[in-house]
Amino acid sequence: MKLYQRQFIEFALSKQVLKFGEFTLKSGRKSPYFFNAGLFNTGRDLALLGRFYAEALVDSGIEFDLLFGPAYKGIPIATTTAVAMAEHHDLDLPYCFNRKEAKDHGEGGNLVGSALQGRVMLVDDVITAGTAIRESMEIIQANGATLAGVLISLDRQERGRGEISAIQEVERDYNCKVISIITLKDLIAYLEEKPEMAEHLAAVKAYREEFGV
């Protein structure tokens, strides 16, 4: 685990974005941890979040031309990541996001920002069922662009309805790499360093045994 990943886990814990306990997910599964990126909800939170996304992007080595944030949660993420790439990595990248409802006046269309073209890096908070990615792919392909990769904050590394995860399905269906700031494996490595969190470690490991990929 790299320094920025450990710092991201501590940031998420401090903002209660990441919690340990017992939580019922939308899928009905009982999970020993919960991650709600919507609680990164202040200016300082967003500035820090962008830096972590930018670190993960640079670390990945994936080449791309433009950042795309799917509405709605991906919009502030794409924006803050673009700012962080410019301020901290001297990479001034175009960014773009979609509207859920197309405008019929003014600039019109369902896209805001730079022209959607070239190799696109899609940024979002998490991938649960992959629905937002599929909707975004239709927009990307309709504009003649290609998907270079997907960046999310957390990869839960757990099976969907079948034997593989929603992330693995996206990688298979769109022949792209999905990267994340942290994974379930990183969370476990972090918990292993914290004796006071031993009860949570046991629960997370048991969950991985049952649902992990």
Curated annotation (Swiss-Prot):
Homodimer. PANTHER family: OROTATE PHOSPHORIBOSYLTRANSFERASE 1-RELATED. Belongs to the purine/pyrimidine phosphoribosyltransferase family. PyrE subfamily. Pfam families: Pribosyltran. Pathway: Pyrimidine metabolism; UMP biosynthesis via de novo pathway; UMP from orotate: step 1/2. HAMAP family: PyrE (MF_01208). GO terms for biological process: 'de novo' pyrimidine nucleobase biosynthetic process; 'de novo' UMP biosynthetic process; pyrimidine ribonucleoside biosynthetic process. The keyword Magnesium applies. This is Orotate phosphoribosyltransferase. The gene is pyrE. GO terms for cellular component: cytoplasm. Orotate binds at residues 34-35, 128, 156. GO terms for molecular function: magnesium ion binding; orotate phosphoribosyltransferase activity. Catalyzes the transfer of a ribosyl phosphate group from 5-phosphoribose 1-diphosphate to orotate, leading to the formation of orotidine monophosphate (OMP). 5-phospho-alpha-D-ribose 1-diphosphate binds at residues 26, 72-73, 99-100, 103, 105, 124-132.
